[in-house]
Curated annotation (Swiss-Prot):
Transmembrane segments: 8-28
Keyword Transmembrane belongs to the record: yes
Family membership: Belongs to the PsbJ family.
Gene3D superfamilies: 6.10.250.2070
Keyword Chaperone: no
Source organism of this protein record: Trichormus variabilis (strain ATCC 29413 / PCC 7937) (Anabaena variabilis)
GO terms under biological process: photosynthesis
SUPFAM superfamilies: Photosystem II reaction center protein J, PsbJ (SSF161021)
Localization terms from the record: Cellular thylakoid membrane
Protein name: Photosystem II reaction center protein J
Oligomeric form and interacting partners: PSII is composed of 1 copy each of membrane proteins PsbA, PsbB, PsbC, PsbD, PsbE, PsbF, PsbH, PsbI, PsbJ, PsbK, PsbL, PsbM, PsbT, PsbX, PsbY, PsbZ, Psb30/Ycf12, peripheral proteins PsbO, CyanoQ (PsbQ), PsbU, PsbV and a large number of cofactors. It forms dimeric complexes.
Function: One of the components of the core complex of photosystem II (PSII). PSII is a light-driven water:plastoquinone oxidoreductase that uses light energy to abstract electrons from H(2)O, generating O(2) and a proton gradient subsequently used for ATP formation. It consists of a core antenna complex that captures photons, and an electron transfer chain that converts photonic excitation into a charge separation.
PANTHER family: PHOTOSYSTEM II REACTION CENTER PROTEIN J
Primary location: membrane
Length: 40
């Protein structure tokens, strides 16, 4: 693997993307669950 070209390592991109997806999905499900709980 060549580490030239100054690009961000793929594992860093994958980690940040994974954390972002988990955070967004978690907030979405928490918001939906809280909304359902308050409406019932």
């Amino acid at each position: 693997m060549s580490a030239g070209s100054g690009r961000i390592p793929l594992w860093v991109v994958a980690t940040i993307a994974g954390l972002g997806v988990i955070t967004v999905v978690g907030i979405f499900f928490y918001g939906a669950y809280a909304g359902l709980g308050s409406s019932i």
